[in-house]
């Protein structure tokens, strides 16, 4: 055990990301690995939130809308576009992932009444699955759930065969929240395009963590 600790300490000392540790509030003697549900608090956030509450809200009141707040969606959209390598006008900032997925599915189905089903798989995030089910029920179309029989990795060929037989909308998470399995956006998006299938990617567990190029892969 002592040898393993020494190996771990040695690897930590060479880790290029170790310089970022001091930028976060970390409880003493705790190893925290949950970054997708609630990540650790960045120290800068405390100062920024305090400034927003005390200065922008407390002192500037309604004038803060014109000074900075009203432009925030565009500013943040521009930053996200840089991270995922997409055009700025393709990024929308507002509401939660679930609400946005609901609105997106509803808009697609209202514009394409010939779509008869929505498909997702067992590696997708539960709330995405619930949204797909509800929308399918509202539009009186079929909800299809592909279960791989494990929580680790999908059977890509099985997925392709499944959605090609049930052409409609498929909703997938780019990175699985349980196993961190990473789907090939390029491969599956091309397959869907070639087979006249609409694919929606949830990037919640990948954006900012891994390199994403939606301009090339979309």
Regions found by a protein language model. Give the residues of each.
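Pyridoxal 5′-phosphate
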Residues: 1-218
């Amino acid at each position: 055990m002592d040898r393993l600790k020494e190996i771990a300490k040695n690897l930590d000392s060479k880790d290029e990301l170790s310089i970022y540790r001091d930028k976060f509030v970390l409880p003493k003697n705790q190893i925290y690995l949950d970054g997708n549900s609630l990540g650790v608090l960045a120290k800068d956030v405390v100062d920024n939130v305090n400034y927003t509450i005390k200065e922008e809200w407390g002192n500037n009141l309604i004038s803060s809308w014109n000074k900075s707040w009203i432009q925030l969606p565009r500013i943040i959209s521009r930053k996200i576009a840089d991270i995922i390598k997409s055009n700025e006008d393709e990024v929308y900032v507002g509401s939660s992932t679930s609400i946005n997925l609901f609105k997106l599915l509803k808009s697609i189905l209202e514009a394409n009444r010939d779509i008869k089903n929505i498909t997702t798989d067992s590696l997708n995030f539960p709330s995405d699955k619930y949204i797909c089910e509800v929308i399918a029920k509202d539009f009186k179309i079929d909800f299809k759930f592909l279960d791989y029989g494990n929580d680790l990795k999908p059977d890509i060929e099985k997925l392709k065969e499944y959605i090609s037989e049930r052409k409609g909308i498929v909703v997938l998470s780019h990175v699985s929240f349980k196993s961190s399995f990473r789907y090939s956006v390029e491969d599956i998006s091309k397959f869907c395009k070639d087979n006249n299938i609409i694919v929606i990617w949830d990037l919640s567990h990948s954006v900012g963590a891994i390199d994403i190029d939606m301009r090339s892969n979309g």
